From Swiss-Prot:
An example Gene Ontology CC term for this record: extracellular region
Keyword Signal part of the UniProt annotation: yes
Domain of life: Eukaryota
Keyword Secreted belongs to the record: yes
Species, as recorded: Homo sapiens
UniProt keywords, alphabetically: Secreted, Signal
Location within or outside the cell: Secreted
Protein name: Putative uncharacterized protein PRO2829
């Protein structure tokens, strides 16, 4: 069984690297500038 604190850490890790992707897609949808983007890669690099 997975411990709750480890599961939470795993979920937060996924959300953290997905945020730049979501923001970039949302900016594109509303026709905003794509310049406002995080320098983090849009995929896990471990």
């Amino acid at each position: 069984m997975v411990r709750p604190h480890l599961l939470k850490k795993k979920i937060l890790g996924r959300v953290w690297w997905l945020m730049p992707v979501v923001l970039a897609l949302w900016e594109a949808e509303v026709g905003g500038s794509l310049e406002v983007r995080s320098l983090r890669p849009a995929w896990p690099t471990w």
